[in-house]
Regions:
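Active-site glycine-centered loops adjacent to acidic/histidine catalytic or metal-binding residues
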Residues: 1, 42-43, 72, 143, ...
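Active-site-proximal beta-strand elements of phosphoester/diester hydrolases
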Residues: 1-6, 100-110, 139-142, 194-200
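N-terminal active-site segment of His-dependent metallophosphoesterases
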Residues: 1-55, 59, 149
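His/acidic metal-ligating clusters that form di-metal
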Residues: 24-37, 115-195
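Metal-dependent catalytic neighborhoods of phosphoester/phosphodiester hydrolases
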Residues: 40-61, 76-89, 151-153, 187-192
Length: 204
């Protein structure tokens, strides 16, 4: 949730999102931790501009590792897809990591509204991918949070059909972890035996 603008001086709720994004990148570099993959869980742009996605790509280029992404409610997928692909960032939604794990990225965007929902296509795709790799553990990524965040304003914009997702995942106990964005705060919950994590935004 970087919420970048085409113009680097623009602010969101008083925060310059380009500067805060750069500060987070600098902090990561300063820690000097190994990094194998960057996963961007949506709301990369606030203004849906191609330039905002280019700014995101420029920021992560210094890590020299692959990046995968999924859309959030603020993103405009045509600009997101073309701009990130031009920057060499893969649109892949299934990533194998070694022999034991896979990462699957779901699109929960309902364009034009803040809440999320997984389409029948997404749920069918997920079930097909999980069934094809029964021996792999799975990390599942999506933008919208499937469990309440404890904030009534945020929770009205959550994943609307989390029960349908839970029904699919119940068949596949090797789905160990889920990671979402959207709520701009840390979350670490148990969801029917799966670990559900959310991370703060780089801005507000």
């Amino acid at each position: 949730d970087t919420h970048l603008f085409a113009e680097k001086h623009e602010t969101l709720l008083g925060v310059n999102t380009w500067e805060s994004y750069q500060a987070v990148l600098d902090a990561i570099h300063a820690e000097k931790r190994p990094c194998d993959l960057i996963v961007a869980t949506g709301d990369l742009a606030q203004d849906q501009s191609s330039a905002a996605y280019q700014h995101f790509a420029e920021g992560i280029a210094s890590f020299s590792v692959p990046c995968v992404w999924l859309p959030g409610n603020h993103d405009f997928q045509p600009a997101m897809y073309s701009s990130l692909q031009e920057a060499g960032i893969s649109p892949a939604k299934c990533v194998f990591t070694g022999d034991q794990w896979q990462i699957l990225l779901l699109d929960s965007q309902v364009f034009g509204v803040p809440h999320g929902e997984l389409s029948d296509y997404q749920l069918d795709w997920l079930e097909t991918k999980l069934a094809a790799e029964p021996n792999r553990n799975t990390l599942l990524l999506l933008h919208h949070h499937p469990l309440p965040a404890g904030c009534s304003w945020l929770d009205q914009h959550s994943l609307r059909n989390s029960a349908a997702l839970d029904s699919v995942l119940a068949k596949f106990p090797r789905v160990k972890n889920l990671l979402c964005g959207h709520i701009h705060q840390e979350q670490d919950l148990d969801w029917n035996g799966r670990r559900l994590l959310a991370t703060p935004s780089t801005c507000v």
